[in-house]
UniProtKB/Swiss-Prot annotation:
Protein name in UniProt: Dehydration-responsive element-binding protein 2A
Listed CDD domains: AP2
Region (Disordered): 1-32, 50-74, 279-304
Keyword Transmembrane: no
Gene of this entry: DREB2A
Function text: Transcriptional activator that binds specifically to the DNA sequence 5'-[AG]CCGAC-3'. Binding to the C-repeat/DRE element mediates high salinity- and dehydration-inducible transcription. Promotes the expression of heat stress-inducible genes by contributing to the formation of a heat stress-specific transcriptional complex with NF-Y subunits (e.g. DPB3-1, NF-YA2 and NF-YB3) at the promoter of target genes, thus promoting heat tolerance.
GO cellular component, one term: nucleus
Polar residues compositional bias, start-end: 286-304
Tissue: Expressed preferentially in roots and stems, and at a lower level in leaves.
Effect the entry attributes to changing residue 91 to A: Affects the binding to the CRT/DRE cis-element
Biased composition (Basic residues): 52-66
Localization per record: Nucleus
Record's subunit section: Interacts with MED25. Binds to DPB3-1 in the nucleus during heat-stress.
Primary subcellular site in the record, as a coarse category: nucleus
Length: 335
Protein backbone atom coordinates (compact mmCIF):
# COMPACT_ATOMS: atom_id res chain seq x y z
CA UNK A 1 0.00 0.00 0.00
CA UNK A 2 1.50 3.36 -1.06
CA UNK A 3 1.22 6.48 1.20
CA UNK A 4 1.40 10.02 -0.26
CA UNK A 5 2.07 13.29 1.54
CA UNK A 6 0.19 16.58 1.06
CA UNK A 7 2.50 17.72 -1.76
CA UNK A 8 1.53 14.75 -3.80
CA UNK A 9 5.00 13.24 -3.82
CA UNK A 10 5.37 9.71 -2.76
CA UNK A 11 7.66 9.56 0.23
CA UNK A 12 6.92 6.15 1.55
CA UNK A 13 5.70 2.90 0.12
CA UNK A 14 4.30 0.11 2.22
CA UNK A 15 3.20 -3.11 0.58
CA UNK A 16 1.35 -5.64 2.67
CA UNK A 17 2.19 -9.06 1.20
CA UNK A 18 0.76 -11.05 4.09
CA UNK A 19 -2.86 -10.25 3.27
CA UNK A 20 -4.88 -13.19 1.91
CA UNK A 21 -8.37 -13.40 0.61
CA UNK A 22 -10.72 -14.57 3.30
CA UNK A 23 -13.50 -17.04 2.76
CA UNK A 24 -16.86 -15.65 1.90
CA UNK A 25 -18.99 -14.75 4.85
CA UNK A 26 -22.33 -13.12 5.45
CA UNK A 27 -22.88 -9.57 6.61
CA UNK A 28 -23.02 -10.73 10.22
CA UNK A 29 -19.62 -12.44 9.90
CA UNK A 30 -20.88 -16.04 9.89
CA UNK A 31 -19.61 -18.55 7.39
CA UNK A 32 -21.71 -20.85 5.26
CA UNK A 33 -20.91 -23.87 7.44
CA UNK A 34 -21.99 -22.04 10.58
CA UNK A 35 -25.22 -20.90 8.95
CA UNK A 36 -25.99 -24.44 7.80
CA UNK A 37 -25.32 -25.73 11.29
CA UNK A 38 -27.80 -23.23 12.71
CA UNK A 39 -30.44 -24.27 10.22
CA UNK A 40 -29.91 -27.91 11.11
CA UNK A 41 -30.31 -27.26 14.83
CA UNK A 42 -33.39 -25.15 14.14
CA UNK A 43 -35.04 -27.87 12.05
CA UNK A 44 -34.35 -30.50 14.71
CA UNK A 45 -35.94 -28.29 17.37
CA UNK A 46 -38.96 -27.48 15.22
CA UNK A 47 -39.57 -31.14 14.43
CA UNK A 48 -39.53 -32.06 18.12
CA UNK A 49 -41.81 -29.22 19.30
CA UNK A 50 -44.13 -28.39 16.41
CA UNK A 51 -47.13 -30.60 15.71
CA UNK A 52 -48.11 -28.87 12.48
CA UNK A 53 -47.27 -30.40 9.17
CA UNK A 54 -44.59 -28.44 7.40
CA UNK A 55 -44.89 -27.45 3.75
CA UNK A 56 -42.72 -29.05 1.15
CA UNK A 57 -40.24 -26.50 -0.24
CA UNK A 58 -40.82 -25.19 -3.73
CA UNK A 59 -39.24 -27.00 -6.62
CA UNK A 60 -37.33 -23.97 -7.76
CA UNK A 61 -35.51 -23.64 -11.05
CA UNK A 62 -33.29 -26.34 -12.55
CA UNK A 63 -32.20 -24.32 -15.57
CA UNK A 64 -28.96 -23.07 -14.02
CA UNK A 65 -27.55 -20.12 -15.97
CA UNK A 66 -29.32 -18.23 -18.70
CA UNK A 67 -29.29 -19.74 -22.17
CA UNK A 68 -25.94 -19.12 -23.81
CA UNK A 69 -24.24 -18.36 -20.49
CA UNK A 70 -21.93 -20.49 -18.43
CA UNK A 71 -19.76 -23.42 -19.50
CA UNK A 72 -20.19 -25.74 -22.49
CA UNK A 73 -21.91 -28.48 -20.47
CA UNK A 74 -24.18 -26.20 -18.48
CA UNK A 75 -27.14 -26.69 -20.84
CA UNK A 76 -27.00 -30.46 -20.31
CA UNK A 77 -26.82 -30.26 -16.52
CA UNK A 78 -30.08 -31.04 -14.70
CA UNK A 79 -28.86 -30.93 -11.09
CA UNK A 80 -30.61 -28.55 -8.74
CA UNK A 81 -28.49 -25.60 -7.53
CA UNK A 82 -25.55 -26.44 -9.84
CA UNK A 83 -24.12 -24.51 -12.78
CA UNK A 84 -20.88 -24.41 -14.73
CA UNK A 85 -18.45 -21.55 -15.15
CA UNK A 86 -17.15 -20.59 -18.58
CA UNK A 87 -13.73 -22.06 -17.68
CA UNK A 88 -15.26 -25.45 -16.83
CA UNK A 89 -15.54 -25.44 -13.04
CA UNK A 90 -18.83 -26.27 -11.36
CA UNK A 91 -20.38 -24.20 -8.59
CA UNK A 92 -23.20 -24.91 -6.15
CA UNK A 93 -25.46 -22.51 -4.27
CA UNK A 94 -28.70 -22.76 -2.33
CA UNK A 95 -31.36 -20.32 -1.19
CA UNK A 96 -32.32 -20.16 2.46
CA UNK A 97 -35.92 -20.96 3.49
CA UNK A 98 -38.65 -18.34 3.42
CA UNK A 99 -37.17 -16.60 0.37
CA UNK A 100 -33.91 -15.91 2.12
CA UNK A 101 -30.60 -15.02 0.53
CA UNK A 102 -28.49 -17.36 -1.52
CA UNK A 103 -25.60 -19.21 0.07
CA UNK A 104 -22.45 -19.92 -1.93
CA UNK A 105 -21.50 -23.57 -1.38
CA UNK A 106 -18.20 -23.67 -3.27
CA UNK A 107 -16.49 -24.56 -6.54
CA UNK A 108 -16.12 -28.20 -7.59
CA UNK A 109 -14.38 -30.07 -10.42
CA UNK A 110 -17.46 -32.11 -11.36
CA UNK A 111 -21.20 -31.55 -11.41
CA UNK A 112 -21.80 -34.61 -9.23
CA UNK A 113 -19.72 -33.21 -6.39
CA UNK A 114 -21.52 -29.88 -6.62
CA UNK A 115 -24.91 -31.65 -6.60
CA UNK A 116 -23.90 -33.66 -3.52
CA UNK A 117 -22.85 -30.48 -1.73
CA UNK A 118 -26.24 -28.97 -2.55
CA UNK A 119 -27.97 -32.05 -1.11
CA UNK A 120 -26.07 -31.76 2.16
CA UNK A 121 -26.99 -28.10 2.49
CA UNK A 122 -30.63 -28.81 1.61
CA UNK A 123 -30.84 -31.51 4.29
CA UNK A 124 -29.49 -29.09 6.85
CA UNK A 125 -31.85 -26.25 5.84
CA UNK A 126 -35.07 -28.09 5.03
CA UNK A 127 -34.73 -31.32 6.99
CA UNK A 128 -36.48 -34.46 5.73
CA UNK A 129 -38.63 -32.42 3.33
CA UNK A 130 -35.64 -31.24 1.30
CA UNK A 131 -35.63 -31.75 -2.45
CA UNK A 132 -32.41 -33.58 -3.30
CA UNK A 133 -30.49 -34.42 -6.43
CA UNK A 134 -29.70 -37.89 -5.05
CA UNK A 135 -32.64 -38.89 -2.81
CA UNK A 136 -31.18 -42.31 -1.95
CA UNK A 137 -27.85 -41.05 -0.64
CA UNK A 138 -27.12 -41.46 3.06
CA UNK A 139 -27.47 -38.49 5.38
CA UNK A 140 -24.28 -36.90 6.62
CA UNK A 141 -23.52 -34.38 9.29
CA UNK A 142 -22.77 -30.77 8.43
CA UNK A 143 -20.00 -29.41 10.63
CA UNK A 144 -17.75 -26.38 10.78
CA UNK A 145 -14.01 -27.03 10.49
CA UNK A 146 -12.52 -23.55 10.22
CA UNK A 147 -13.27 -19.96 9.31
CA UNK A 148 -12.46 -20.75 5.67
CA UNK A 149 -14.59 -23.91 5.31
CA UNK A 150 -17.57 -24.14 3.05
CA UNK A 151 -19.95 -27.15 3.06
CA UNK A 152 -18.26 -29.69 5.35
CA UNK A 153 -19.41 -33.29 5.51
CA UNK A 154 -18.34 -36.36 7.41
CA UNK A 155 -16.53 -38.69 5.07
CA UNK A 156 -18.53 -41.88 4.64
CA UNK A 157 -18.75 -44.27 1.71
CA UNK A 158 -21.08 -42.83 -0.89
CA UNK A 159 -20.94 -39.24 0.38
CA UNK A 160 -19.14 -36.03 -0.55
CA UNK A 161 -15.68 -35.27 0.80
CA UNK A 162 -14.91 -32.16 2.88
CA UNK A 163 -14.37 -29.01 0.84
CA UNK A 164 -12.21 -26.01 1.80
CA UNK A 165 -11.46 -22.86 -0.12
CA UNK A 166 -7.98 -21.50 -0.88
CA UNK A 167 -7.11 -17.79 -1.38
CA UNK A 168 -8.00 -18.08 -5.07
CA UNK A 169 -11.58 -18.92 -4.10
CA UNK A 170 -11.41 -22.51 -5.35
CA UNK A 171 -12.53 -25.44 -3.27
CA UNK A 172 -10.13 -28.30 -2.53
CA UNK A 173 -10.73 -31.59 -0.76
CA UNK A 174 -9.85 -31.73 2.91
CA UNK A 175 -6.93 -34.11 3.52
CA UNK A 176 -8.41 -37.00 5.42
CA UNK A 177 -6.24 -39.87 4.19
CA UNK A 178 -9.13 -41.72 2.50
CA UNK A 179 -10.16 -41.27 -1.12
CA UNK A 180 -13.73 -39.91 -1.48
CA UNK A 181 -16.53 -42.11 -2.73
CA UNK A 182 -19.46 -40.38 -4.34
CA UNK A 183 -23.04 -41.47 -4.56
CA UNK A 184 -23.30 -40.94 -8.29
CA UNK A 185 -20.21 -42.99 -9.04
CA UNK A 186 -21.50 -45.85 -6.90
CA UNK A 187 -24.92 -45.58 -8.50
CA UNK A 188 -23.40 -45.54 -11.97
CA UNK A 189 -21.30 -48.61 -11.20
CA UNK A 190 -24.34 -50.45 -9.86
CA UNK A 191 -26.33 -49.49 -12.93
CA UNK A 192 -23.53 -50.74 -15.21
CA UNK A 193 -23.40 -54.01 -13.31
CA UNK A 194 -27.16 -54.34 -13.57
CA UNK A 195 -27.07 -53.61 -17.29
CA UNK A 196 -24.30 -56.18 -17.81
CA UNK A 197 -26.28 -58.74 -15.83
CA UNK A 198 -29.41 -57.99 -17.85
CA UNK A 199 -27.45 -58.28 -21.12
CA UNK A 200 -25.94 -61.58 -19.98
CA UNK A 201 -29.34 -62.93 -18.99
CA UNK A 202 -30.88 -61.71 -22.26
CA UNK A 203 -28.12 -63.23 -24.37
CA UNK A 204 -28.45 -66.53 -22.52
CA UNK A 205 -32.22 -66.50 -23.00
CA UNK A 206 -31.85 -65.77 -26.74
CA UNK A 207 -29.24 -68.53 -27.06
CA UNK A 208 -31.50 -71.09 -25.38
CA UNK A 209 -34.50 -69.95 -27.43
CA UNK A 210 -32.76 -70.27 -30.80
CA UNK A 211 -31.14 -73.56 -29.76
CA UNK A 212 -34.55 -75.06 -29.01
CA UNK A 213 -35.89 -73.84 -32.36
CA UNK A 214 -32.94 -75.34 -34.26
CA UNK A 215 -33.30 -78.64 -32.41
CA UNK A 216 -37.02 -78.75 -33.26
CA UNK A 217 -36.28 -78.08 -36.93
CA UNK A 218 -33.64 -80.83 -36.97
CA UNK A 219 -36.12 -83.28 -35.45
CA UNK A 220 -38.75 -82.39 -38.04
CA UNK A 221 -36.21 -82.79 -40.83
CA UNK A 222 -35.10 -86.21 -39.57
CA UNK A 223 -38.70 -87.32 -39.17
CA UNK A 224 -39.46 -86.24 -42.75
CA UNK A 225 -36.47 -88.23 -44.04
CA UNK A 226 -37.60 -91.35 -42.15
CA UNK A 227 -41.15 -91.03 -43.47
CA UNK A 228 -39.86 -90.62 -47.03
CA UNK A 229 -37.70 -93.74 -46.74
CA UNK A 230 -40.63 -95.75 -45.37
CA UNK A 231 -42.86 -94.58 -48.22
CA UNK A 232 -40.23 -95.55 -50.79
CA UNK A 233 -39.89 -98.98 -49.23
CA UNK A 234 -43.64 -99.48 -49.38
CA UNK A 235 -43.81 -98.42 -53.03
CA UNK A 236 -40.82 -100.52 -54.18
CA UNK A 237 -41.14 -104.27 -55.10
CA UNK A 238 -39.14 -106.94 -53.33
CA UNK A 239 -38.27 -110.60 -53.98
CA UNK A 240 -41.41 -111.63 -52.14
CA UNK A 241 -43.49 -109.93 -54.84
CA UNK A 242 -41.97 -112.14 -57.60
CA UNK A 243 -41.31 -115.45 -55.89
CA UNK A 244 -41.84 -117.49 -52.81
CA UNK A 245 -41.02 -115.80 -49.57
CA UNK A 246 -38.43 -117.48 -47.41
CA UNK A 247 -40.87 -118.12 -44.60
CA UNK A 248 -43.55 -119.87 -46.73
CA UNK A 249 -44.14 -123.51 -45.87
CA UNK A 250 -43.64 -125.62 -49.05
CA UNK A 251 -44.28 -129.01 -47.47
CA UNK A 252 -47.88 -129.12 -48.72
CA UNK A 253 -46.79 -128.86 -52.41
CA UNK A 254 -46.61 -132.01 -54.58
CA UNK A 255 -43.25 -132.75 -56.17
CA UNK A 256 -44.96 -134.01 -59.36
CA UNK A 257 -46.31 -130.50 -59.97
CA UNK A 258 -42.82 -129.07 -60.01
CA UNK A 259 -40.04 -129.22 -62.58
CA UNK A 260 -36.45 -128.21 -62.87
CA UNK A 261 -35.81 -125.43 -65.38
CA UNK A 262 -32.17 -126.42 -65.88
CA UNK A 263 -33.16 -129.98 -66.69
CA UNK A 264 -35.78 -128.78 -69.17
CA UNK A 265 -33.28 -126.57 -70.98
CA UNK A 266 -30.77 -129.41 -71.10
CA UNK A 267 -33.35 -131.71 -72.66
CA UNK A 268 -34.31 -129.09 -75.25
CA UNK A 269 -30.72 -128.70 -76.37
CA UNK A 270 -30.29 -132.48 -76.85
CA UNK A 271 -32.15 -135.20 -78.91
CA UNK A 272 -33.23 -137.40 -76.07
CA UNK A 273 -36.56 -135.68 -75.77
CA UNK A 274 -37.49 -136.41 -79.39
CA UNK A 275 -36.28 -139.98 -79.08
CA UNK A 276 -38.37 -140.54 -76.02
CA UNK A 277 -41.45 -139.01 -77.64
CA UNK A 278 -41.14 -141.12 -80.84
CA UNK A 279 -40.57 -144.29 -78.91
CA UNK A 280 -43.58 -143.60 -76.73
CA UNK A 281 -45.90 -142.78 -79.63
CA UNK A 282 -44.47 -145.11 -82.28
CA UNK A 283 -43.02 -148.17 -80.65
CA UNK A 284 -42.32 -149.81 -84.05
CA UNK A 285 -40.14 -146.99 -85.27
CA UNK A 286 -36.50 -146.42 -84.48
CA UNK A 287 -34.34 -143.34 -84.56
CA UNK A 288 -30.66 -143.80 -85.19
CA UNK A 289 -28.12 -141.08 -85.81
CA UNK A 290 -30.82 -138.52 -86.37
CA UNK A 291 -32.52 -140.41 -89.30
CA UNK A 292 -36.02 -141.70 -89.05
CA UNK A 293 -36.50 -145.20 -90.48
CA UNK A 294 -39.89 -146.84 -90.22
CA UNK A 295 -39.89 -150.34 -88.98
CA UNK A 296 -42.23 -151.41 -91.81
CA UNK A 297 -39.53 -150.71 -94.37
CA UNK A 298 -37.03 -152.70 -92.43
CA UNK A 299 -39.32 -155.74 -92.48
CA UNK A 300 -40.35 -155.32 -96.15
CA UNK A 301 -43.69 -153.80 -95.40
CA UNK A 302 -45.08 -151.56 -98.17
CA UNK A 303 -46.44 -148.29 -96.83
CA UNK A 304 -48.66 -147.85 -99.86
CA UNK A 305 -50.38 -151.08 -99.04
CA UNK A 306 -50.94 -149.97 -95.50
CA UNK A 307 -52.72 -146.96 -96.86
CA UNK A 308 -55.09 -149.01 -99.04
CA UNK A 309 -58.62 -148.50 -97.80
CA UNK A 310 -60.36 -150.88 -100.29
CA UNK A 311 -59.86 -148.56 -103.29
CA UNK A 312 -58.47 -150.19 -106.45
CA UNK A 313 -54.94 -149.15 -107.27
CA UNK A 314 -54.35 -146.37 -109.65
CA UNK A 315 -53.67 -147.58 -113.18
CA UNK A 316 -52.20 -145.44 -115.90
CA UNK A 317 -53.88 -146.34 -119.14
CA UNK A 318 -54.19 -144.40 -122.37
CA UNK A 319 -57.63 -143.65 -123.63
CA UNK A 320 -58.96 -142.19 -126.79
CA UNK A 321 -55.59 -142.33 -128.52
CA UNK A 322 -53.99 -140.16 -125.81
CA UNK A 323 -50.44 -141.49 -125.33
CA UNK A 324 -49.42 -139.08 -122.60
CA UNK A 325 -49.15 -141.79 -120.03
CA UNK A 326 -47.38 -144.21 -122.38
CA UNK A 327 -44.06 -142.50 -121.93
CA UNK A 328 -44.25 -142.75 -118.15
CA UNK A 329 -43.66 -146.45 -118.09
CA UNK A 330 -40.01 -145.95 -117.26
CA UNK A 331 -40.87 -144.45 -113.86
CA UNK A 332 -40.71 -146.81 -110.96
CA UNK A 333 -43.57 -145.56 -108.91
CA UNK A 334 -43.32 -148.35 -106.42
CA UNK A 335 -39.86 -147.31 -105.36
Amino acid sequence: MAVYDQSGDRNRTQIDTSRKRKSRSRGDGTTVAERLKRWKEYNETVEEVSTKKRKVPAKGSKKGCMKGKGGPENSRCSFRGVRQRIWGKWVAEIREPNRGSRLWLGTFPTAQEAASAYDEAAKAMYGPLARLNFPRSDASEVTSTSSQSEVCTVETPGCVHVKTEDPDCESKPFSGGVEPMYCLENGAEEMKRGVKADKHWLSEFEHNYWSDILKEKEKQKEQGIVETCQQQQQDSLSVADYGWPNDVDQSHLDSSDMFDVDELLRDLNGDDVFAGLNQDRYPGNSVANGSYRPESQQSGFDPLQSLNYGIPPFQLEGKDGNGFFDDLSYLDLEN
